[in-house]
């Protein structure tokens, strides 16, 4: 048996235990101050007792040091528990923390934090803290470029979604813009689309980073490479044949930009005027040739000749301007901001305005820029042109159901071809179809422009343009007959006492 004498106190100096000696049978006596441990113990037990005594010695020493911090006697810190505290938790927490209530209010910060932490972590009943309120929504400064509402920090500055996308596209495609004024245009949320040159310059001025765009592009490319494409698009032989026929019809009636010998003219290249007659005559001549090629393209489309003559004419009149605009916009060169016609004539934006496009100019150039991300090849352009032409929702059709049946394989062919060409971009097909809606909007404005244009030109509108692009009723007041050279594309029949009438081409 071991005897424990607890008459010792930390105030006695906290002496270390001493082993007085061993008797027979392995009896040993340990002394620590006035405490004595006697009994039959082995080496392991003696070591355990010594460790306990050493720990008690360290606690007593700590208590003495703490008492000297603020003048409290060691008895206030019950680290060395007295006999009546055995079996109770430290500081008698189950008693309501009476020991802490006895402390003065001016405890050192270290002791105050210790007491709070001990209470919160030792209590059996935890009081849940009230949920913190949600953080307020982040408010960004207005767009540094156009002062519109900002969506966050993009490429180094606070900017709106519009300016972010414009800057990204401009850098990724190495766009070169031209200012048609004094290169000092005001850029705000109303005027930001009027001058791309000044808008891009302001992006640089406010601190947008080219390098940030390149890093973002590389990251997206890496993500695309990691995608696994599981869809397979099988193409039956009859669809392959359809695609080849449409592609061949397009290429043989519309040479690509790389096949043309481009040339330019200096006529009114620097400033806008209401109408440059020299450019207008050249443009009307080229437009007439282009219309003839579109008619030839339509006749070579599979199934088009099976429609009634009336439906063929209706479809051509309705879609001719759509296809004309689509074709010229595919010959847009963003670096020089120019468009090239079928004979190689290349006009800049100002010259296109002066040639007769007028207020339609910026709308046409904006559409051309929207086509660039689609990266359509000749086959896709031909299929999209055919879909524009053979469309059952045109007014005054005799057999709209038959037209819809002819359009269905064209839609399927474009979908499969586009997805096979871009396996990682299945969204390209619907984006191409959406361009048909844009083309129709441009055609509507083009018809309005033709009516005002006839008031600006000195003579009559060229007959084929009048027949295919405009409403003939709008030109009934034209008194002078057109020159014979301009009547070649269509057949006319004149009778005495009757107005000149046109027959089907």
UniProtKB/Swiss-Prot annotation:
Residue span of region Disordered: 1-57, 113-134, 462-505
Biased amino acid composition, Basic and acidic residues: 12-22, 32-46, 485-505
GO BP, sorted A to Z: cellular response to corticotropin-releasing hormone stimulus; retinoic acid receptor signaling pathway
Chain residue ranges for the region called Hinge: 209-237
MF GO annotations: nuclear glucocorticoid receptor binding; nuclear receptor activity; RNA polymerase II cis-regulatory region sequence-specific DNA binding; zinc ion binding
Compartment(s) of residence: Nucleus
PANTHER family according to UniProt: NUCLEAR HORMONE RECEPTOR, RETINOIC ACID RECEPTOR GAMMA
Record-given protein name: Retinoic acid receptor gamma
The organism's taxonomic lineage, starting at the top: Eukaryota, Metazoa, Chordata, Craniata, Vertebrata
